[in-house]
Amino acid sequence: MCLAYFVSGYFKLVSPQWRNGQAIFDVLNTETFGRPNMAELIQDKTNLQKTVTWCTLVFELMFPLVLFTPYPVVYIFFLGGVLLHGGIALVMGLNSFFWAFIATYPALWICSLQLQAVLGY
């Protein structure tokens, strides 16, 4: 799962639309997963577009750190994932995507605890 997030973040990072902060607006304008009414709402809000786009990108690139993050902070990663995938489910209608990714979080938490025990922190 960490690899899935990281690779997704990497390919977003090399995309000009993600780097310039326009990707969320572009996604909302797609025929398959778009929501033209939502795209229209954020059309003139370039700071919001950039913030959401870059928060998504940074979250995905940093997610592998969940394996090395101590107990209370790991929940911030999981909360970020729930918000990210919840937003995707609501906006794009990808409900099974939400459940598939969130279902892996307990296993990631256990792996995180075991890895931290091995590393001694």
Model-predicted segments: where are they?
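Short tryptophan-centered beta-strand motifs in secreted/extracellular beta-sheet-rich domains
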Residues: 64-65
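Juxtamembrane boundary at the C-terminal end of a transmembrane helix
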Residues: 109-121
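C-terminal ends of transmembrane helices
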Residues: 10-13, 83-89
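Central hydrophobic cores of alpha-helical transmembrane segments
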Residues: 77-87, 101-105
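Membrane-interfacial catalytic/cofactor-binding modules of polytopic membrane enzymes
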Residues: 2-59
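A cytosolic-side transmembrane-helix exit/cap motif
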Residues: 43, 95-104, 118-121
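Transmembrane helix interruption/hinge and helix-loop junction motifs
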Residues: 68-75, 91-95
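Membrane-interface transmembrane-helix boundary segments in multi-pass integral membrane proteins
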Residues: 47-56, 90-102
